[in-house]
């Protein structure tokens, strides 16, 4: 996005990573916001501040944490952990829509192929992703025919640190056979930012 001349506002709970990005890019290219995406006060304050920079053209909701266990091993903490992604998606979407006056904005919900099927040992994670899909589909119906465009993205199997706490489920060797995040991001962005008079509403991307 920055390479295409966009001003990007990035949100993360990782202050160290945000400091690295802030050092890498000038203020007119990147603004960092550090906090909990499920903290409503933080969301409201952040969106209000971002809106002072100009109209918000694109919101990308990409947060999520995995929990891979056999069905009987799940506890309440696992459910809460997975649901943070859904709650954050809703809060950021609502505040962004308000800030934009529900006009001229594209919202990309980055979910997972787990939102399209049931996977063994991912019951709670799948339940959360199906919830995100349901929310996204409802938004698409609510804003059909308007200048609010909602895009559902379902990528599956990406070579990142996402699986670092689940090595009994996805080994490091297996992880490295998954999609690379760079080319995946390029494919997603190609569909999100272009001059064509169309919107690709659903994108499912599977590894080879």
Task: Spell out what each predicted region is.
Residues 6-18:
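Conserved glycine-rich Rossmann-like NAD(P)H-binding loop of the short-chain dehydrogenase/reductase
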Residues 44, 65-78, 121-124, 163:
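Conserved mid-core segment of classical short-chain dehydrogenase/reductases
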Residues 48, 52, 84-104, 141:
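Amphipathic alpha-helical dimer-interface segment in Rossmann-like NAD(P)H-dependent oxidoreductases
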Residues 56-64, 85, 109, 151:
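Rossmann-fold scaffold of SDR-type NAD(P)-dependent oxidoreductases
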Residues 65, 72-91, 108, 132:
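Catalytic Tyr-X3-Lys loop
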Residues 100, 117, 138-148:
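Active-site-adjacent segment of SDR/Rossmann-fold oxidoreductases
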Residues 112:
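Residue(s) in the substrate-gating loop at a strand-loop-helix junction
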Residues 148, 152, 172-208:
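C-terminal helical subdomain
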